[in-house]
Amino acid sequence: MNTTQQTVLNGTPCIMLSAGGYEAYIAYEIGSNVIRLRDVKNGIDVFRFSPDNTEETLKQSAEVWGLPTLYLPNRFADGVLKTSDAVYHLPVNEAAPYHNHIHGFLHKRVHTVISHHADENCAVLRTSYDYDEKDPFFKYLPLRFRVELTFTLSEYGLEHKFALINLSEKALPVSVATHTTIQAPFLDGAKPENMRLTVPIGKRCELNERCLPTERLLDLKLSDLEYKNGTKCPMLQNLDNDMYQAEAGKLDGQDFYGVIVEDEPTGKKICYEVSPEYKFWIIWNDKGFNGYFCPEPMTAMIDAPNLGLPADVTGYQELKPHGVFEANQRFFTV
């Protein structure tokens, strides 16, 4: 039977969804982070998870556990964000030599539970966050907006639907990502060296020493092609913000816009599908020996509003007053 319920996971208030052989715990007070997604039947933990994590641990390092949703993700040079009708100065929260603003604030805010319910097909949670003068970040970015998140769990996995609504009278920058943390190994009893990652990619986006785009798009080298042909081990080596244009790949002979992680000895896979709004992948693994890696889908390049490249290359867009932007993701195992 599919269910939803209010619960507490080691001190962290959550809504638990159970459906289709999966269980998901969403910490609505920590940015609606999916702090655990488990395929119960196959013994797979999709996202980085520790049963010892307290609420305080998750709050202090929200970017590196579960599925954190980021608004204004990754880096903005010197904290500057230029839109078509304004220039905003965000706090520089990444120290020298980087000196950038990084990752925004949405993933650290207390979200509101709108509703949760289950039926014979699925279990659903809807949360929201209203950004206005009450948010301490508003002095840097005085643009009202609303974020609505819908999580649907079923036999088809977990769907994550993101909606951004501009409630201001000015242009609202659109740059959205999830700092997706994949447990490594993800299968009970498996070994990280047996994992292989497939990421269908186009050009590599060159980054400078501050982890900002040089605006050069590079042809793929042999190490890049390991992502494309599915031979890349995402652990036990340092993958440090490898950034690429996203392309479509194949899953069981069908077009698949997303990444696939496989445990080679068993053939078990995590399939991570995203909607076309996500135009870039960044791969990062915290030096490769900490039990997780991050295939991060982004709707726009790092520092996109400040770049000289055209919007159809950077992915950057803006919402007019009362406009709505939506993007979707789905996680499932095979």
List each model region and its residues.
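Intrinsically disordered, low-complexity Pro/Gly/Ser/Thr-rich segments with frequent PxxP/GP/PP motifs
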Residues: 314-325
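Extended, loop-rich substrate-binding clefts of extracytoplasmic carbohydrate-active enzymes
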Residues: 1-9, 18, 86, 91-154
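Acidic/His-leaning functional-site neighborhoods
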Residues: 100-112, 116, 230-314
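A short, structured loop/turn motif at beta-sheet edges
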Residues: 82-86, 115-125, 152-157, 186, ...
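Active-site/ligand-binding surface loops and adjacent short beta/alpha elements
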Residues: 89, 171-172, 181-275
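Beta-strand-rich N-terminal accessory domains
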Residues: 1-95, 252-278, 287, 323-332
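Acidic, contiguous internal or C-terminal segments within carbohydrate-active enzymes
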Residues: 17, 28, 39, 129-180, ...
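Short, conserved secondary-structure segments in the cores of folded domains
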Residues: 77-78, 137, 315
